[in-house]
């Protein structure tokens, strides 16, 4: 067993006492099957003080993104930085450092090959600045300057890149306090290819919390996936997607405070006002 962990670049298995589980009001956070089944299903759009927040179809989400790039001239790296910062901020609010005791909490960030993976890289960098200890698994990096730069930034900040993830859920549960799902975003379609099919299968057996960026990976953007991963935290970016109505985790945040008011009105997003200068807003 120790030889396997050495092969994975993970070192000796750390005992669970080193990284105590996050303690919430009323007891520990253990997002296993019991808490998942007990959560009520959230149907329809979220009702906020200012009205009903719109949940986007895949087509609507793509149209909003295209207008941000083409009409409003945002760049990909610009929105990626804002989105990744939002994700790290939401994680820090849902799982504050004070919940973990004296040791910096270890966080496994699993990044996919697209922009969602880029959001994860930015998120990891900000988590490091916030005092967490992220490690990244990035098995399918695109050959593009933007992603090369994001990887370099993480490496310069001494964030390790792991060649493999532990092959058993219990190993991840022992080594990490949180897993960030940055594999697939709202534009994903079709069957899940390897190595991500195996990774999602491992994640489906975790008891540590999963934080999903924009959409839980492996879920249909509109219909969800009753047999898919079950995140404890969902960070919807720009606006929530329809699959978020099926989210039954503890924390749902909205991030990506960059939507121009005219674009919001055009698509009737009805986004709630962000508090003060915050870049995230808690929806549940």
UniProtKB/Swiss-Prot annotation:
Any Gene Ontology CC annotation: extracellular space
Cofactor(s) recorded in Swiss-Prot or TrEMBL: K(+)
Coiled coil residues, start to end: none
Sites of N6-succinyllysine modification: 140
Principal cellular location given in the protein's record: mitochondrion
Residues of the YjeF N-terminal domain: 61-271
Subcellular location: Mitochondrion; Secreted
InterPro entries named in the record: YjeF_N_dom, YjeF_N_dom_sf, YJEFN_prot_NAXE-like
EC number: 5.1.99.6
Record text on cofactor binding: Binds 1 potassium ion per subunit.
Transit peptide, start-end: 1-55
Enzyme class: isomerase
GO molecular function, one term: NAD(P)HX epimerase activity
A UniProt-annotated Pfam family: YjeF_N
Binding site for K(+): 116, 181, 217
Key words of the record: Isomerase, Lipid transport, Metal-binding, Mitochondrion, NAD, NADP, Nucleotide-binding, Potassium, Secreted, Transit peptide, Transport
PTM characteristics: Undergoes physiological phosphorylation during sperm capacitation, downstream to PKA activation.
Reactions catalysed according to its record: (6R)-NADHX = (6S)-NADHX; (6R)-NADPHX = (6S)-NADPHX
Residues annotated for (6S)-NADPHX binding in this entry: 115-119, 185-191, 214
Job of this protein: Catalyzes the epimerization of the S- and R-forms of NAD(P)HX, a damaged form of NAD(P)H that is a result of enzymatic or heat-dependent hydration. This is a prerequisite for the S-specific NAD(P)H-hydrate dehydratase to allow the repair of both epimers of NAD(P)HX. Accelerates cholesterol efflux from endothelial cells to high-density lipoprotein (HDL) and thereby regulates angiogenesis.
Family named by the database record: Belongs to the NnrE/AIBP family.
Description of how the protein assembles with itself and partners: Homodimer. Interacts with APOA1 and APOA2.
Protein name stated in the entry: NAD(P)H-hydrate epimerase
Species: Monodelphis domestica
Gene: NAXE
